[in-house]
């Protein structure tokens, strides 16, 4: 197969229209700088700093909320309780979710043993800059203190339901017959009051079913059902998927995993009323084990949510990829095995798949080439393109985002050898012409470490962490770099 070199090379110094500095000399200690989303669209960013702990063990955090253009929306302080006065006990940020003008901050107390307890929340209205409510997730815990330290075995996961509030998924593994598996799934409003609660009617022989939240938005909730038996939390397997209505909690789709092969699903997404799942598949054995280097092809399974039925199931052996030298176990000649990083559905119903090849050496991988696969509406191969990129010890793909005016999609990945020799690569795929154009940006900076993150449409975020923070005066610089793309 003919190898394709990079079609467009951009070598430039950074020039940014919008930026935000995280000041080293500012009060408190830097905790995080995170993007937050409205469904799948970037809405803004929030910086969090830990300020101080008073004599009553109240830990004060300062927040600064920015919009997607890095303009300040609001700022203020929130407080969280520390369980004891031990220096080893820390209050840490666990997650941030945004829904309908509200930011919900989740915190844990972490102890010297590494255990997490006392998951608590604070909800902020970013329009009025007021704290709406605060509380502890587990209602059995009346206060964050030593007295209740060992009372909770539940794990709580929070997700945004957009305009419909927040989803709380409480899961507890088996401890004894008196304390069995437990799973509570419910939606809450701005006052943290329950809107609806979901109770599953599905059983799996003599096992317990616990659900993992995979994706949520204004319309749907996608959950993965795991079957457990006994008190061994490693002895479980994925048995089915369900889709719920975000507004009511009603089950819309029940999808069982095919027993024909062993599946490793790399992606799950809902688009246009269809659930898409896919990844590698393996020959079935009695113990449901598999060799990660012995897959036999790619699978894509599609379910129709409205009709609650299977729409399509495609099994694609590797030998069907005619324009790449690949054996029946997914090994590309001279380049190694394939790992599939991203599968996107194009507006015309076709698919764009991004993959990287790698060699497995002991416990580490060396990543070699980059591949793109064009697939038709039934997930059959149309065209494969191979790109020459640097070998790296880690994978290169980072994230993707839409190009302006829905003209295509940009895929971002690093070729990294060391901090002084970075390459930011941006692969633009255009829907109308089906053209692929790669930009290569060399990044050389002796004074800082660089990473990238999602930004508003048409831009990429650059985070620059300064090595000599005292000299620079800043801890880090967050900036937006405008993308070069074609207008079709």
Task: Report the location of each language-model feature.
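Sec-dependent N-terminal signal peptides
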Residues: 4-14
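Secretory-pathway ectodomains
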Residues: 18-488
């Amino acid at each position: 197969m003919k190898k394709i070199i990079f079609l467009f090379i951009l070598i430039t110094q950074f020039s940014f229209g919008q930026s935000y500095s995280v000041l080293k000399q500012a009060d408190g200690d830097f905790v995080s700088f995170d993007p937050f989303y409205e469904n799948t669209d970037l809405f803004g960013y929030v910086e969090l700093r830990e300020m101080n702990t008073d004599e009553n063990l109240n830990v004060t955090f300062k927040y600064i909320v920015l919009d997607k253009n890095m303009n300040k929306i609001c700022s203020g302080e929130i407080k969280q309780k520390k369980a004891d006065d031990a220096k080893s006990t820390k209050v840490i940020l666990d997650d941030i979710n945004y829904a309908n003008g509200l930011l919900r901050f989740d915190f844990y107390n972490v102890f010297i043993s590494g255990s997490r307890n006392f998951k608590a929340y604070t909800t902020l209205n970013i329009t009025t800059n007021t704290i709406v409510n605060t509380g502890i997730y587990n209602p059995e815990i009346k206060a964050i203190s030593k007295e209740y330290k060992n009372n909770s075995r539940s794990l709580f996961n929070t997700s945004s339901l957009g305009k419909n509030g927040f989803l709380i998924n409480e899961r507890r593994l088996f401890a004894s017959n008196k304390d069995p598996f437990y799973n509570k799934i419910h939606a809450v409003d701005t006052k943290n009051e329950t809107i609806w609660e979901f109770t599953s009617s599905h059983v799996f022989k003599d096992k317990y079913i616990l659900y993992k939240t995979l994706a949520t938005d204004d319309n749907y909730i996608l959950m993965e059902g795991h079957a457990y038996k006994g008190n061994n939390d490693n002895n479980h397997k994925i048995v089915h998927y369900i889709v719920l209505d975000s507004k009511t909690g009603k089950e819309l789709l029940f999808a069982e995993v095919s027993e024909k092969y062993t599946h490793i699903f790399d992606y799950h997404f809902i688009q246009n009323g269809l659930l898409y799942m896919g990844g590698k598949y393996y020959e079935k054995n009695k113990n449901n084990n598999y060799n990660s280097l012995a897959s036999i092809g790619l699978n894509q399974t599609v379910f129709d949510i409205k009709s609650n039925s299977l729409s399509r199931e495609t099994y694609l052996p590797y030998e069907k990829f005619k324009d790449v030298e690949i054996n029946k176990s997914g090994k590309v000649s001279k380049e190694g095995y394939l790992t599939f990083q991203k599968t996107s559905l194009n507006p015309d119903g076709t698919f764009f798949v991004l993959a990287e090849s790698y060699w497995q050496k002991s416990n580490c991988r060396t990543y070699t080439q980059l591949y793109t696969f064009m697939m038709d509406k039934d997930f059959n191969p149309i065209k494969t393109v191979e790109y020459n990129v640097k070998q790296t010890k880690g994978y290169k793909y980072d994230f993707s985002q839409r190009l302006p005016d829905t003209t295509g999609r940009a895929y971002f990945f690093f070729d990294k050898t060391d901090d002084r020799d970075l390459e930011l690569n941006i692969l633009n795929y255009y829907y109308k012409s089906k053209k692929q154009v790669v930009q290569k940006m060399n990044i050389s900076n002796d004074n800082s470490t660089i990473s990238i993150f999602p930004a508003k449409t048409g831009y990429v975020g650059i985070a620059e962490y300064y090595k000599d923070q005292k000299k620079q005066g800043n801890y880090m610089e967050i900036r937006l770099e405008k993308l070069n793309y074609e207008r079709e």
